[in-house]
Amino acid sequence: MAAEPPADGRDPPADDGAAGDGAVESAAAEALLSAASEQLTLVYQGEVYVFDPVPPQKVQAVLLVLGGSDMPPGLVSMAVPTTFDEKSTTVAARRIASLMRFREKRKERCFDKKIRYSVRKEVAQKMKRRKGQFAGRADFGDGSCSSAPCGSTANGEDDHIRETHCQNCGISSRLTPAMRRGPAGPRSLCNACGLMWANKGTLRSPLNAPKMTVQHPADLSKTGDTDDSKANLCAEHNQTTMKTDTEMVPEQEQKADVLPPTKEEDSMATS
């Protein structure tokens, strides 16, 4: 027979097993609710255990170790936005800080051209020149000159004073394009000997060197006088030839006027 319900209308007391399951479920619910506020509260056999603070990840790990199920999706959705918000705020703060540092560095930068051409022009005018090109200290010593004209006059004097000769063939530095390095040091060989020494490592025989002499100003004046005298002689010779030509022209014209007699004139003369 089925058991009749009590007269007061109350439900009969549940079994011990059903009561135990209800207690476990209530304890788990309380633990989850407290975990949402980062405070874990456990009720076991009438005793309450409170752990503060405990993150939701640790609660889920404990439930997995105890053999329970994963955390409810509602609790996870409640906990994830907080962490996402923290990450977004940290990223935004870092970006703002880096942007501020970049702006501070940009203020210190200067993109203007700092080339001062006037200063460069003054330096170029003070530098020594040789044949229109910049020359080093080795060519002119340690002396300094403050202007380009002064440098040009000094160059002429130095070229006249520091005339050197090739140590191999004896040719002057004025008769070669450039003096080159040799076994005795720089500017010790002429252009031809220096090139042969640089390419083949040997010196050419002095017999093959061209014999060229330097013409001094006095010699140049003498040669100029001789050239003038030759030019005068040529002019006089041309004038005499022109005179002879003019004198010979009338005689040729007279000869041209005298023509040989024709056959008719000869026949009339004979008759």
Curated annotation (Swiss-Prot):
Region (Disordered): 1-23, 238-271
Gene Ontology biological process terms in this record: regulation of DNA-templated transcription
Main location: nucleus
GO cellular component: nucleus
Bias type Basic and acidic residues, positions: 252-271
Membrane-traversing stretches: none
Domain CCT: 95-137
Zinc finger (GATA-type) stretch: 166-193
Alphabetical list of SUPFAM superfamilies matching this protein: Glucocorticoid receptor-like (DNA-binding domain)
Record's subcellular location: Nucleus
All copies of domain Tify, residue ranges: 33-68
InterPro entries: CCT_domain, TIFY-like, Tify_dom, Znf_GATA, Znf_NHR/GATA
Keyword Nucleus attached: yes
Domain of life where this protein originates: Eukaryota
Pfam families in the cross-refs: CCT, GATA, tify
Swiss-Prot/TrEMBL keywords: Activator, DNA-binding, Metal-binding, Nucleus, Transcription, Transcription regulation, Zinc, Zinc-finger
Disulfide bond sites: none
Annotated function: Transcriptional activator that specifically binds 5'-GATA-3' or 5'-GAT-3' motifs within gene promoters.
Family: Belongs to the type IV zinc-finger family. Class C subfamily.
Protein name (record): GATA transcription factor 19
Annotated organism of origin: Oryza sativa subsp. indica
